[in-house]
């Protein structure tokens, strides 16, 4: 599901078209499709990652609003006690943002800002993105080796 603002983010921040991104997915649903499979708890999923997660979406999820498929699908994930991961990227944060994050965290939601890691000494932006994506997938129990993992040893300077 790609929101209107998600589509704008893709256009502004990536070299991909919206259609190219949709083709990467096994399934794609319109943001207004409240009848989509993911809007029902009987449709089995491992969980859900909202990336990026706006403060509007965070607030809607925290308050149980379901006027958008992303909000409804997140609500379903919560009620079914599945894994929900929110990649919030707003800064700085004010008290309402933090209260909404705390409320969701207490419900078992993983709040995971896409903060880059540098211990693996990434040489490209793609390596930074791959590492963040790998960490997000790890949260849902989906393990891919898209980037080096911390081994306890310092990486030599490239």
Stretches with model-predicted labels:
Residues 1-85, 91-158:
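A cross-family phosphate/adenosyl-ligand binding-site feature
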């Amino acid at each position: 599901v790609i929101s209107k603002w998600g589509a704008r983010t893709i256009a502004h921040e990536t070299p991909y078209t919206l259609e190219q991104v949709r083709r990467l997915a096994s399934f794609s649903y319109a943001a207004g499709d409240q009848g989509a499979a993911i809007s029902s708890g009987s449709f089995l999923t491992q969980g859900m990652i909202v990336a990026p997660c706006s403060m509007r979406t965070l607030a809607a999820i925290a308050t149980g609003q379901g006027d958008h498929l992303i909000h409804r699908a997140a609500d379903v994930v919560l009620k079914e006690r599945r894994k929900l991961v929110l990649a919030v990227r707003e800064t700085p944060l004010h008290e309402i943002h933090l209260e909404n994050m705390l409320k969701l965290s207490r419900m078992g939601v993983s709040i995971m800002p896409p903060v880059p890691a540098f211990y693996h000494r990434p040489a490209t932006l793609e390596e930074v993105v791959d590492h963040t994506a790998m960490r997000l997938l790890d949260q849902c129990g989906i393990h891919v080796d898209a980037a080096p993992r911390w081994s306890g040893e310092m990486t030599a300077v490239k």
